[in-house]
Structure formats: C-alpha cells, structure tokens
Curated annotation (Swiss-Prot):
Belongs to the tRNA(Ile)-lysidine synthase family. PANTHER family: TRNA(ILE)-LYSIDINE SYNTHASE-RELATED, TRNA(ILE)-LYSIDINE SYNTHETASE. Its EC number is 6.3.4.19. This is tRNA(Ile)-lysidine synthase. The keyword ATP-binding applies. GO terms for biological process: tRNA modification. InterPro entries: Rossmann-like_a/b/a_fold (IPR014729), TilS/TtcA_N (IPR011063), tRNA_Ile_lys_synt (IPR012094), tRNA_Ile_lys_synt_N (IPR012795).
Amino acid sequence: MGEGGESLSGAASRFRADWQALDPSGRVCLAVSGGPDSLALMLLMQEVAPRDFCVATVDHGLRAESAAEAAMVAGLCEMRGIAYHTLRLDLAGGSAVQERARKARYAALADLARRDGLSAVVTAHHADDQAETLVMRLNRGAGLRGLAGMRAASSVPGAGEVRLLRPLLGWRRAELVALVEDAGLAPVLDPSNHDHRYERVRIRDVMASTKALLPSGFAASASHLAEADAALEWAVERLWLDIGMSAEGSTWNPPEDLPRVLALRLLERVVMHLGGTVPRGPDLVRWLATLRAGGVATLAGVKGDARSGAWRFSRAPEHRSDRRPD
C-alpha cells in the first residue's frame, strides 16, 4: 500500500458513498487519459460499478506519444474486460492550446455519450484540482459562481443535456497516486503538467512548496460557495416567476431593496431568454445601473426601459445594432 494510501477495498467503500451521492443512472463514460488520477477512477469504478461504465480516451494528436498512451489505456481495458473507445482528434498547436483541447475533448466525449446512450461523462478531477481552480479564479477576481469551483454534478460544457460527474472532488491527488501504485500500474506522465508556461502548473508548484496552503481547505471552501450559489439560483428561480417573462418580453416592478447580485442574475437570464446569448459581466453591471437610474439601453439584442419606473424588457428591433449600456 502506497505511503499515506489505503487498500483498494477500503478506498472502494469510501468511493461508493461518493458515487451514490451523485445519483447516477444508467451506463456512464469515464474519461481516462492514462494519468494516475483517471486510472484511479477506473480502478474504483470497477470495484463499485463494474457493469455500469465504459472508458474513453481522447487522443488530441498534439504529442508524438499520445497514440501510444491511448493504446496503453486500451490494453489495460482489454485485460480487465472493460469496454473502451479511443477518440482521435487532430488539433493544431499554438496559442490557447490547452483551452482549445479542453473544448474539443468535452465535445468528443459528449458526442460519444449521445451516440451510445450514456447517461453521463465522468472525470477524475480531485481536491487538488479544485484548490488550483479556486486560486486561479481568485486571481481573476471571480464572483460567487466562479469561486464555487467545479461542481460534483453539472453538465458537459457546450452540451447541457449531457451530465458531467466528478466523484473524486473530495480526494487528494496523493491518495489516487497511491492507489495506482499499489495496483502495479504505470501511469502516463504528461509533460505539460510540469510546464511553467501554464498558470495552473505555477500555482500547483507554489501550493506544493508550502504547508501554509491546504488544498483540502480550499476544496471545502469551494463546496460551501457552491451551496451559496445554489441558494442564490433558488431565489432567482422564484423571482423569475414573478417577472412572468414571455417570448416577447415582460414588464416588472422590481423590489426597491432587490440585492444587486440577484438583480444581475435576473438580468443575465433576461438577456439569455430574449437574446439567446450569455452577456459579459461588466455589460450587465452597466445595464443594471442604467435601469436603476430610470434609463433605457440595449444589451445583446434586448431592450431594457425603466423610464416609467417599471422595468420593461423586449427584443430590440433587428435593424438597430446593439450597443453597450452607457
């Protein structure tokens, strides 16, 4: 058993509770790169739900070694009797390659889930990943939604109908590495995980170099913030019913003491409902200021008019170009 680790059977008992808490249904697809985190996920799932998953490895085509790494995962799956898929992409290198690879990877996994009738995509993000994400978003001045970090259950980005499950958010990286070592598996070691050109790698190294920063504490805080964000969405849902939004718009008298954060969430939903796009945060702030001042402005094809006191929302005439609120 690896240093600081636990037996696979003991870990599986713990994982079973984490997995069942996500209320999984039907077969799911595990995203397995061959790294220690995703191999540990595969080991745990085979202990807990051996008939309920398949494995998918995405070969982005960005490194010469990627085809061999995908073949390694395929070989492991064959030995263990696990159904697997290798999804090959042809991405070009260059700027923002990690973000482009992430989007393409999720799109490929979502396509597989739709095609094969799988109920969810499952990834091996863990507590250390969550802590790094939280620090990155703190550096950017993120709001509550961003600081809530990764959710244990959400939707695949760009494919809202496909569930995305992350059952390992309460697990540390070292625990997962130990499970893989104890199983005698040799994981893939991606060199980009040590490339200091990437912000996440720099943050990871700083957090590892000091005992003053506890990833488990960051991850717990992200979980608490996610609960607060869910409570905010609960309130927005109820206010949305008061607005009575139709396909053409609505007129609404907002409470005078409506908290700013609720107002911004509601305006975001108005724009998404009538304009079909997700507005930028700074534009929403300016739009809210205009409405609270009794003005009129258009944002992303949606007109907001508060000159009568009530807030009236409608689609802007198509021949007029959208302008940002003053």
